[in-house]
Amino acid sequence: MTNFSSSPPIAFGDLQGCHAAYRQLFDTLAPAADTPLWFAGDLVNRGPASLATLREIVALGERAIAVLGNHDLHLLAVAAGIRTLKPGDTIGEILDAPDADDLIEWVRHRPFAHFERGMLMVHAGLLPQWDAALALELADELQRALRAPNWRDTLRSLYGNDPNCWSPDLKHADRLRVAFNAFTRIRFCTPEGAMEFRANGGPAAAPAGYLPWFDAPGRKTADVTVVFGHWAALGLMLRENLVALDSGCVWGNRLSAVRLTDDPAARVVTQVACERCGAADE
Protein backbone atom coordinates (compact mmCIF):
# COMPACT_ATOMS: atom_id res chain seq x y z
CA MET A 1 0.00 0.00 0.00
CA THR A 2 1.06 3.56 -0.67
CA ASN A 3 0.72 6.59 1.55
CA PHE A 4 -2.90 7.73 1.60
CA SER A 5 -3.63 10.70 -0.64
CA SER A 6 -6.61 13.00 -0.29
CA SER A 7 -7.11 12.81 -4.06
CA PRO A 8 -9.08 9.82 -5.34
CA PRO A 9 -6.94 7.56 -7.54
CA ILE A 10 -7.38 7.50 -11.29
CA ALA A 11 -7.36 3.91 -12.59
CA PHE A 12 -6.36 3.13 -16.18
CA GLY A 13 -7.26 0.08 -18.22
CA ASP A 14 -4.79 -2.11 -20.09
CA LEU A 15 -2.32 0.09 -21.99
CA GLN A 16 -0.57 -2.74 -23.87
CA GLY A 17 1.96 -0.46 -25.48
CA CYS A 18 -0.59 2.07 -26.78
CA HIS A 19 1.54 5.05 -25.83
CA ALA A 20 -0.14 7.71 -27.97
CA ALA A 21 -3.57 6.86 -26.57
CA TYR A 22 -2.21 6.89 -23.02
CA ARG A 23 -0.62 10.31 -23.53
CA GLN A 24 -3.86 11.67 -24.97
CA LEU A 25 -5.88 10.29 -22.07
CA PHE A 26 -3.39 11.52 -19.47
CA ASP A 27 -3.37 15.01 -21.00
CA THR A 28 -7.16 15.06 -21.13
CA LEU A 29 -7.37 14.13 -17.46
CA ALA A 30 -4.59 16.54 -16.46
CA PRO A 31 -4.36 14.96 -12.98
CA ALA A 32 -2.99 16.99 -10.10
CA ALA A 33 0.52 16.10 -9.01
CA ASP A 34 -0.73 14.37 -5.85
CA THR A 35 -3.28 12.17 -7.66
CA PRO A 36 -2.36 8.47 -7.42
CA LEU A 37 -2.36 6.72 -10.79
CA TRP A 38 -3.42 3.08 -10.82
CA PHE A 39 -2.79 0.71 -13.71
CA ALA A 40 -4.67 -2.58 -13.95
CA GLY A 41 -1.82 -4.51 -15.56
CA ASP A 42 -0.70 -5.33 -19.10
CA LEU A 43 1.29 -2.15 -19.57
CA VAL A 44 3.02 -3.73 -22.57
CA ASN A 45 2.67 -6.00 -25.59
CA ARG A 46 0.76 -6.07 -28.87
CA GLY A 47 0.61 -2.29 -29.16
CA PRO A 48 3.16 -0.35 -31.24
CA ALA A 49 5.10 1.39 -28.44
CA SER A 50 5.68 -0.97 -25.54
CA LEU A 51 9.09 0.47 -24.69
CA ALA A 52 7.94 4.10 -24.58
CA THR A 53 4.88 3.13 -22.54
CA LEU A 54 6.87 1.21 -19.96
CA ARG A 55 9.48 3.94 -19.61
CA GLU A 56 6.79 6.55 -19.07
CA ILE A 57 5.06 4.59 -16.31
CA VAL A 58 8.40 3.85 -14.62
CA ALA A 59 9.20 7.57 -14.70
CA LEU A 60 6.08 8.31 -12.65
CA GLY A 61 7.87 6.85 -9.64
CA GLU A 62 5.87 5.99 -6.53
CA ARG A 63 2.86 7.85 -7.88
CA ALA A 64 2.17 4.88 -10.18
CA ILE A 65 0.64 1.70 -8.76
CA ALA A 66 0.73 -0.99 -11.45
CA VAL A 67 -0.31 -4.59 -10.80
CA LEU A 68 1.13 -7.41 -12.87
CA GLY A 69 -0.81 -8.65 -15.87
CA ASN A 70 -0.29 -11.71 -18.03
CA HIS A 71 1.55 -9.72 -20.72
CA ASP A 72 3.87 -8.13 -18.17
CA LEU A 73 4.65 -11.61 -16.86
CA HIS A 74 5.20 -12.86 -20.42
CA LEU A 75 7.84 -10.14 -20.74
CA LEU A 76 9.55 -11.45 -17.60
CA ALA A 77 9.33 -15.04 -18.84
CA VAL A 78 10.88 -14.20 -22.21
CA ALA A 79 13.62 -12.18 -20.52
CA ALA A 80 14.32 -15.17 -18.26
CA GLY A 81 14.48 -17.63 -21.15
CA ILE A 82 11.37 -19.47 -19.96
CA ARG A 83 9.20 -18.56 -22.95
CA THR A 84 9.86 -17.36 -26.49
CA LEU A 85 8.45 -14.44 -28.42
CA LYS A 86 5.15 -15.18 -30.16
CA PRO A 87 3.71 -13.69 -33.37
CA GLY A 88 2.20 -10.33 -32.50
CA ASP A 89 4.48 -9.70 -29.51
CA THR A 90 5.91 -6.19 -29.38
CA ILE A 91 8.15 -6.59 -26.34
CA GLY A 92 11.32 -7.26 -28.31
CA GLU A 93 12.18 -3.57 -28.26
CA ILE A 94 12.16 -3.66 -24.45
CA LEU A 95 14.49 -6.66 -24.36
CA ASP A 96 16.84 -4.94 -26.82
CA ALA A 97 16.84 -1.57 -25.05
CA PRO A 98 20.00 -0.30 -23.30
CA ASP A 99 18.00 0.00 -20.07
CA ALA A 100 16.41 -3.44 -20.44
CA ASP A 101 17.81 -4.79 -17.17
CA ASP A 102 16.43 -1.87 -15.17
CA LEU A 103 13.03 -2.13 -16.85
CA ILE A 104 12.79 -5.87 -16.25
CA GLU A 105 13.72 -5.38 -12.59
CA TRP A 106 11.03 -2.73 -12.23
CA VAL A 107 8.39 -5.03 -13.71
CA ARG A 108 9.55 -7.93 -11.54
CA HIS A 109 8.96 -5.87 -8.42
CA ARG A 110 5.36 -4.91 -9.20
CA PRO A 111 2.58 -6.33 -6.99
CA PHE A 112 -0.13 -8.78 -7.97
CA ALA A 113 -2.75 -6.89 -5.95
CA HIS A 114 -3.17 -3.48 -4.38
CA PHE A 115 -5.66 -2.54 -1.66
CA GLU A 116 -6.46 1.01 -0.60
CA ARG A 117 -9.56 3.05 0.28
CA GLY A 118 -11.67 -0.12 0.36
CA MET A 119 -10.71 -0.91 -3.24
CA LEU A 120 -8.83 -4.01 -4.38
CA MET A 121 -7.07 -3.86 -7.74
CA VAL A 122 -5.94 -6.97 -9.61
CA HIS A 123 -5.36 -7.64 -13.28
CA ALA A 124 -7.87 -10.38 -14.11
CA GLY A 125 -9.92 -11.46 -11.13
CA LEU A 126 -10.40 -13.35 -7.90
CA LEU A 127 -11.75 -16.70 -6.78
CA PRO A 128 -15.06 -16.70 -4.90
CA GLN A 129 -13.64 -18.35 -1.77
CA TRP A 130 -11.15 -15.54 -1.20
CA ASP A 131 -11.91 -12.54 0.94
CA ALA A 132 -9.74 -9.45 0.52
CA ALA A 133 -7.39 -10.51 3.32
CA LEU A 134 -6.70 -13.92 1.75
CA ALA A 135 -6.28 -12.38 -1.71
CA LEU A 136 -3.67 -9.99 -0.33
CA GLU A 137 -1.94 -12.82 1.53
CA LEU A 138 -1.66 -14.85 -1.68
CA ALA A 139 -0.54 -11.82 -3.66
CA ASP A 140 2.18 -11.21 -1.09
CA GLU A 141 3.37 -14.82 -1.36
CA LEU A 142 3.63 -14.48 -5.13
CA GLN A 143 5.34 -11.11 -4.91
CA ARG A 144 7.95 -12.36 -2.47
CA ALA A 145 8.61 -15.41 -4.64
CA LEU A 146 9.15 -13.29 -7.76
CA ARG A 147 11.47 -10.93 -5.89
CA ALA A 148 13.67 -13.75 -4.57
CA PRO A 149 17.01 -14.73 -6.18
CA ASN A 150 15.49 -17.93 -7.62
CA TRP A 151 12.62 -16.04 -9.28
CA ARG A 152 13.24 -17.65 -12.66
CA ASP A 153 12.61 -21.13 -11.26
CA THR A 154 9.50 -19.87 -9.52
CA LEU A 155 8.13 -18.21 -12.64
CA ARG A 156 8.71 -21.37 -14.67
CA SER A 157 6.67 -23.35 -12.13
CA LEU A 158 3.73 -20.94 -12.28
CA TYR A 159 2.76 -21.65 -15.88
CA GLY A 160 0.11 -24.37 -16.23
CA ASN A 161 -3.62 -24.89 -15.81
CA ASP A 162 -3.70 -27.33 -12.90
CA PRO A 163 -4.99 -27.23 -10.29
CA ASN A 164 -7.79 -24.99 -11.54
CA CYS A 165 -9.61 -24.41 -8.26
CA TRP A 166 -8.79 -23.24 -4.78
CA SER A 167 -8.30 -25.38 -1.72
CA PRO A 168 -6.79 -24.23 1.56
CA ASP A 169 -4.86 -27.51 1.53
CA LEU A 170 -2.83 -26.54 -1.55
CA LYS A 171 0.89 -26.28 -0.92
CA HIS A 172 3.97 -24.78 -2.55
CA ALA A 173 3.83 -24.43 -6.36
CA ASP A 174 0.21 -25.59 -6.64
CA ARG A 175 -0.93 -22.89 -4.20
CA LEU A 176 1.02 -20.20 -6.03
CA ARG A 177 -0.10 -21.39 -9.47
CA VAL A 178 -3.79 -21.16 -8.59
CA ALA A 179 -3.28 -17.64 -7.28
CA PHE A 180 -1.19 -16.68 -10.32
CA ASN A 181 -3.90 -17.86 -12.70
CA ALA A 182 -6.70 -16.12 -10.84
CA PHE A 183 -4.88 -12.82 -10.55
CA THR A 184 -3.72 -12.76 -14.18
CA ARG A 185 -5.83 -15.09 -16.36
CA ILE A 186 -9.34 -15.78 -15.09
CA ARG A 187 -12.50 -14.72 -16.91
CA PHE A 188 -14.94 -17.54 -16.27
CA CYS A 189 -15.33 -20.04 -13.44
CA THR A 190 -17.95 -22.45 -12.18
CA PRO A 191 -20.17 -21.41 -9.27
CA GLU A 192 -17.71 -23.35 -7.11
CA GLY A 193 -14.72 -21.43 -8.48
CA ALA A 194 -13.16 -23.90 -10.96
CA MET A 195 -11.40 -21.75 -13.56
CA GLU A 196 -11.75 -22.03 -17.35
CA PHE A 197 -8.86 -20.72 -19.46
CA ARG A 198 -9.88 -21.02 -23.13
CA ALA A 199 -12.93 -18.80 -23.57
CA ASN A 200 -12.21 -15.09 -24.05
CA GLY A 201 -15.53 -13.76 -25.33
CA GLY A 202 -17.98 -11.66 -23.40
CA PRO A 203 -20.25 -12.90 -20.61
CA ALA A 204 -22.86 -14.09 -23.11
CA ALA A 205 -20.24 -16.48 -24.53
CA ALA A 206 -19.66 -18.25 -21.21
CA PRO A 207 -19.14 -22.00 -21.67
CA ALA A 208 -21.88 -24.22 -20.29
CA GLY A 209 -21.67 -24.42 -16.52
CA TYR A 210 -19.48 -21.31 -16.21
CA LEU A 211 -20.15 -17.68 -15.40
CA PRO A 212 -18.06 -14.50 -15.06
CA TRP A 213 -15.86 -14.81 -11.99
CA PHE A 214 -17.40 -11.71 -10.42
CA ASP A 215 -20.90 -13.22 -10.61
CA ALA A 216 -19.97 -16.38 -8.70
CA PRO A 217 -22.52 -16.81 -5.89
CA GLY A 218 -21.23 -15.95 -2.44
CA ARG A 219 -18.07 -14.24 -3.73
CA LYS A 220 -16.28 -13.12 -0.59
CA THR A 221 -14.83 -9.94 -2.09
CA ALA A 222 -18.31 -8.54 -2.74
CA ASP A 223 -17.79 -6.29 0.30
CA VAL A 224 -14.99 -4.31 -1.39
CA THR A 225 -14.74 -2.59 -4.75
CA VAL A 226 -12.72 -4.75 -7.14
CA VAL A 227 -10.87 -2.91 -9.91
CA PHE A 228 -9.58 -5.01 -12.80
CA GLY A 229 -8.70 -5.14 -16.50
CA HIS A 230 -7.76 -8.06 -18.77
CA TRP A 231 -11.17 -8.76 -20.31
CA ALA A 232 -11.47 -6.68 -23.47
CA ALA A 233 -14.60 -8.51 -24.64
CA LEU A 234 -16.31 -7.51 -21.39
CA GLY A 235 -15.40 -3.89 -21.91
CA LEU A 236 -15.85 -1.00 -19.53
CA MET A 237 -18.28 -1.93 -16.78
CA LEU A 238 -19.11 -0.09 -13.58
CA ARG A 239 -21.13 -1.52 -10.75
CA GLU A 240 -21.29 -0.30 -7.17
CA ASN A 241 -18.50 -2.68 -6.15
CA LEU A 242 -16.90 -3.51 -9.49
CA VAL A 243 -14.84 -1.49 -11.99
CA ALA A 244 -13.84 -3.30 -15.20
CA LEU A 245 -11.39 -1.16 -17.16
CA ASP A 246 -10.18 -3.02 -20.27
CA SER A 247 -12.11 -1.45 -23.14
CA GLY A 248 -9.93 -2.94 -25.87
CA CYS A 249 -7.58 -0.11 -26.78
CA VAL A 250 -5.05 -2.46 -28.35
CA TRP A 251 -7.81 -3.81 -30.62
CA GLY A 252 -8.58 -0.32 -31.92
CA ASN A 253 -11.41 0.48 -29.51
CA ARG A 254 -10.99 2.81 -26.51
CA LEU A 255 -8.68 3.42 -23.58
CA SER A 256 -10.55 4.09 -20.36
CA ALA A 257 -9.76 5.69 -17.03
CA VAL A 258 -12.02 6.01 -13.99
CA ARG A 259 -11.66 8.41 -11.07
CA LEU A 260 -12.18 6.10 -8.10
CA THR A 261 -14.18 8.25 -5.74
CA ASP A 262 -15.43 6.62 -2.55
CA ASP A 263 -19.01 7.22 -3.72
CA PRO A 264 -19.67 4.88 -6.66
CA ALA A 265 -22.24 7.28 -8.11
CA ALA A 266 -19.59 10.00 -8.39
CA ARG A 267 -17.05 7.96 -10.37
CA VAL A 268 -16.19 9.69 -13.62
CA VAL A 269 -15.18 7.81 -16.77
CA THR A 270 -12.84 9.38 -19.33
CA GLN A 271 -12.08 7.65 -22.64
CA VAL A 272 -10.08 8.24 -25.80
CA ALA A 273 -10.28 6.45 -29.14
CA CYS A 274 -7.47 4.09 -30.11
CA GLU A 275 -7.70 3.88 -33.90
CA ARG A 276 -3.91 3.98 -34.21
CA CYS A 277 -3.33 1.10 -31.81
CA GLY A 278 -4.83 -1.91 -33.55
CA ALA A 279 -3.02 -5.20 -32.84
CA ALA A 280 -2.92 -8.14 -35.19
CA ASP A 281 -5.51 -10.82 -34.57
CA GLU A 282 -4.53 -13.50 -32.07
From Swiss-Prot:
It catalyses: P(1),P(4)-bis(5'-adenosyl) tetraphosphate + H2O = 2 ADP + 2 H(+). Keywords: Hydrolase. Pfam families: Metallophos (PF00149). Its EC number is 3.6.1.41. It is an enzyme of class 3 (hydrolase). The keyword Hydrolase applies. It comes from the Bacteria. The keyword DNA-binding does not apply. SUPFAM superfamilies: Metallo-dependent phosphatases. GO terms for molecular function: bis(5'-nucleosyl)-tetraphosphatase (symmetrical) activity. PANTHER family: CYTOCHROME C5 (PTHR40942:SF4), PTHR40942. Hydrolyzes diadenosine 5',5'''-P1,P4-tetraphosphate to yield ADP. Belongs to the Ap4A hydrolase family. This is Bis(5'-nucleosyl)-tetraphosphatase, symmetrical. It comes from Burkholderia pseudomallei (strain 668). The gene is apaH.
